[in-house]
Amino acid sequence: MIQFQPVLGSLKSYEAGKPIELVVREFGIDPDQIIKLGSNENPFGCAQPVVEAVQKAASKMPYYPDDSYLELKTALASKFDLTPDRIILGNGSDQVLDFACRCVLGPGDSILINRITFAMYRIYALQCGAKVHSTETVLHDLNAFLDLAKSIRPKIIFLCTPSNPIGDALFKSDVYDFLRQIPSNTLVVIDAAYMEFGKKKDSNTFISAKEVTDLFPNVFYTGTFSKAYGLGGMRIGYGIGSKELISNLYKMRPPFNVANLSALAATEALKNESHVESYLDNNLKEMKRYEKFAAEQSVEFIDSYANFITFFARKRGKSSTEISQSLLKQGIILRNLRSYDLNAIRITIGKPQQNDRVLTALNQEFS
């Protein structure tokens, strides 16, 4: 019998949002009538020039990409005003998070995370044999982080801001005050997958990748093309840090870890920032409709700096599982946060007509 690593006994695979195909099989609903607002994807998709560029380059599929990815890294370097050797690309930003864990953690080491946060931090750490410590608060509390950091001395601290899965955000000034109190030999990962949305809502939440990694060489800043840029299906993200950090992370990177068409799509997306701005405008406008609904129905929610909103189901008679299942039967895919030990649902902000349908359905559930 194969002897598997003991840590696998305590590991659970990441639970992704329900795909449209599964809902079709489960409920027999016409796929064209299904609204997928459970995985925080861009409902408008990527910019049309990105689609055209990928279609034009389809003949490149048989060939490996340029493993230096210099064109994309140069474009990102220009965007962030730094040099390409401070950037590493990944098959989604979660891959560069994996690089960081494997580069720093060993058996018996510790990480520090928020109680409610992106599940992959825990998974990657456990895969390395590390211990996972978390705060007790739902929202990020940097004082709680500091208290724990002093006692457990973690090798890595993860700050997800704006937060996945619930959308709260930290102010830049508070993050900088926190970083000044963290030992320089502790890696602090700032997961900025939703930073574009936070910046749009309140510039005080914006953390510059260049500035923070210049001031604090122990910071690793990660971002993605999956959310604001609408390239979730292309699986491409990036990490930014000091030259020393990036050069060591590269030792964990497999060859050709980003597909050539994905790299091309990301490069083209950076030339079409107006598409992103249009989406951010829609997100902010439509978010207010959900906030208005919550106020009218006395539904508790979390002030969100991302492209989704979290509604709590407590004191409403129905659980988050019942609500999400009821909407699923109507062809509306939301995210039930019960797996995070929250009696809450999370709704990706969609197109206006999609939100019309969701709000009508939610009115029936919460009234």
UniProtKB/Swiss-Prot annotation:
EC id: 2.6.1.9
InterPro entries linked to this entry: Aminotrans_II_pyridoxalP_BS, Aminotransferase_I/II_large, HisP_aminotrans, PyrdxlP-dep_Trfase, PyrdxlP-dep_Trfase_major, PyrdxlP-dep_Trfase_small
Molecular function in Gene Ontology: histidinol-phosphate transaminase activity; pyridoxal phosphate binding
Keywords, ordered alphabetically: Amino-acid biosynthesis, Aminotransferase, Histidine biosynthesis, Pyridoxal phosphate, Transferase
Pathway: Amino-acid biosynthesis; L-histidine biosynthesis; L-histidine from 5-phospho-alpha-D-ribose 1-diphosphate: step 7/9
First-tier enzyme category under EC: transferase
Pfam families per UniProt: Aminotran_1_2
Domain of life according to the entry: Bacteria
CDD domains: AAT_like
Cofactor(s) needed: pyridoxal 5'-phosphate
Coiled-coil region list: none
Record GO biological process: L-histidine biosynthetic process
Catalytic activity: L-histidinol phosphate + 2-oxoglutarate = 3-(imidazol-4-yl)-2-oxopropyl phosphate + L-glutamate
Keyword GTP-binding carried by entry: no
Residues found modified as N6-(pyridoxal phosphate)lysine: K227
HAMAP family: HisC_aminotrans_2 (MF_01023)
Family that this chain belongs to: Belongs to the class-II pyridoxal-phosphate-dependent aminotransferase family. Histidinol-phosphate aminotransferase subfamily.
Subunit structure: Homodimer.
Name used for this protein in its record: Histidinol-phosphate aminotransferase
Gene: hisC
